[in-house]
Amino acid sequence: MEITFENVRDIIVETLSCDVEDIKLDTNLVEDLEADSLEIVELSMALQEKLGAGIEDEDLEKIHSVQDILDYIKGKQG
């Protein structure tokens, strides 16, 4: 599956049980969506499962926004 904002957004909505309208590129996972550390790990696992591109455990603390997720995954791919 291609790495797009829409694909990542849909995984976030499914994993964090939030509204699709709440997800923008600058949406902060913790501050805006109130995700805790366990939910961030679950999100990384869902990204790995559905997109084949998760976030390394040691890098999770660097991920704050949806844009961070996209940049990280695209950076790892190419």
Language-model features: where?
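Two-component histidine kinase catalytic core, primarily the HATPase_c
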Residues: 39
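C-terminal structural segments of small proteins and small subunits
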Residues: 61, 67-73
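Phosphopantetheine carrier-protein modules
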Residues: 15-34, 51-62
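Thiotemplate assembly-line natural product biosynthesis machinery
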Residues: 1-21, 75-77
